[in-house]
Amino acid sequence: MEQGKKETPTVYLHDIKREYTQGETRLTILDSTKLALWAGQSVALVAPSGSGKSTLLHIAGLLESPDAGEVYIGGIATSGLSDVERTQIRRTDIGFVYQSHRLLPEFTALENVMLPQMIRGLKRAETVKRAQEILAYLGLEDRVTHRPAELSGGEQQRVAIARAVANAPRVLLADEPTGNLDPQTADHVFNALMQLVKATRVSMLIATHNMELADRMDRRVSLENGHVVELD
């Protein structure tokens, strides 16, 4: 863990170990894995399929618990927290973007972005204002009343990004967010993500196979034999 000595990483994975059982075989996916994410930094996680990219994202996002090690969010150790406390951290400090946008089809773009804030109990007027601002920032101000089926693939993914940052998280975790998009649309979605990193100083970790996009990020890391390796 480097960066500034006085700066606390938004997410720090310390000596993470995760194993799975396949038949009678015990597979080690992550082994004493360490990774720090810093405010305003974009990090590409590039590694072959089956290497543990999704597992690492799930653990960093408190969706899955490691067999050993500690996940720190904003300097707070999470292993001793209750399920309720972990859920609260996910809602306030972590945003998720997936390859499949998972928007609610019966909701408009605006309502989809409002939802995470409503779950937190924020007032409707406040959630409407913030959702409109984020959608406008991502160039979707004329799509707020459209439902997902009325939007293009790139527009749907930008709505998903807006939803992910609606609660102003510390960290944004994205699993192949441009994987289902054509190159031009993927570039637009990636640019939207990078704009948000610069504007909000959120930390962003993206698992991707797109090396062209990875090369445009602040850092590139890979997984080798369960360990995080920094790439040049």
Swiss-Prot record:
InterPro entries in alphabetical order: AAA+_ATPase, ABC_transporter-like_ATP-bd, ABC_transporter-like_CS, ABC_transpr_LolD-like, MacB-like_ATP-bd, P-loop_NTPase
Family: Belongs to the ABC transporter superfamily. Lipoprotein translocase (TC 3.A.1.125) family.
Residues annotated as binding ATP: A47, P48, S49, G50, S51, G52, K53, S54
GO biological process: lipoprotein localization to outer membrane; protein localization to outer membrane
Xref: Pfam families: ABC_tran
Record GO terms (molecular function): ATP binding; ATP hydrolysis activity; transmembrane transporter activity
Function statement: Part of the ABC transporter complex LolCDE involved in the translocation of mature outer membrane-directed lipoproteins, from the inner membrane to the periplasmic chaperone, LolA. Responsible for the formation of the LolA-lipoprotein complex in an ATP-dependent manner.
Cellular compartments annotated: Cell inner membrane
EC category name: translocase
Membrane topology classification: Peripheral membrane protein
Subunit-structure text: The complex is composed of two ATP-binding proteins (LolD) and two transmembrane proteins (LolC and LolE).
Enzyme Commission number(s): 7.6.2.-
Protein name: Lipoprotein-releasing system ATP-binding protein LolD
Alphabetized UniProt keyword annotations: ATP-binding, Cell inner membrane, Cell membrane, Membrane, Nucleotide-binding, Translocase, Transport
SMART domains: AAA (SM00382)
Originating organism: Nitrobacter winogradskyi (strain ATCC 25391 / DSM 10237 / CIP 104748 / NCIMB 11846 / Nb-255)
Main location: membrane
